[in-house]
């Protein structure tokens, strides 16, 4: 969009890059610290380091694809459990972010589900307008789907995708499932599969 691309790096960074790279002879900023600047190298416009700036601990890998709607970029941070699959290093770190697409600054964030993360959070945000109400859907690491007002992050609703008596057991032995797929909206209906 507008000659830029947004992606999540393997270092848990949300990156905005110039699709021309340095072929256009310009170092578009505000990020100007590229190590390599030849015509075959990438030109980063801004970089949001979710690991160091917000304390996100991506379990396995930060994996979502950013969603751009209007002036905002929505991402799920992949905040999750440690290698032992039990402790959550930073349950207060944001799980969901809305970022200004021009500056890379966080507009709003949510740390839901905090200490209820089962494993990790790897899905991609979804945008829809159920009942004519614009909303962005985030897939919580607790098996809940969260709906937020896109501009200010007000929680509109949330829904547990598991039976109330379900139990989480690592290794797929339990009846509680986390969310790995991405929701699809058609009209006022949201479709989403869960599994462990």
Label each residue range with its predicted role.
Residues 1-196:
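Noncatalytic, solvent-exposed loop/strand surfaces
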């Amino acid at each position: 969009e507008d000659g830029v691309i947004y992606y999540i790096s393997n270092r848990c960074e949300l990156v905005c890059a110039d699709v021309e790279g340095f072929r256009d002879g310009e170092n578009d900023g505000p990020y100007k610290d590229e190590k390599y600047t030849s015509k075959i190298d990438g030109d980063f416009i801004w970089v949001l380091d979710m690991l160091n700036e917000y304390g996100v601990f991506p379990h396995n890998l930060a994996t979502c694809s950013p969603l751009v709607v209007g002036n905002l970029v929505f991402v799920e941070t992949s905040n999750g459990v440690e290698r032992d699959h039990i402790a959550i290093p930073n349950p207060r770190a944001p799980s969901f972010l809305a970022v200004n697409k021009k500056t890379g600054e966080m507009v709003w964030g949510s740390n839901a589900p905090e200490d209820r993360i089962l494993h990790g959070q790897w899905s991609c945000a979804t945008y829809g307008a159920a009942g004519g109400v614009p909303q962005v859907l985030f897939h919580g690491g607790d098996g809940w789907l969260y709906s937020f007002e896109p501009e200010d992050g007000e929680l509109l609703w949330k829904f547990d995708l598991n039976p109330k008596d379900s139990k989480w057991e690592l290794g797929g032995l339990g009846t509680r499932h986390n969310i790995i797929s991405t929701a699809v909206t058609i009209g006022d209906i949201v479709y989403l599969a869960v599994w462990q």
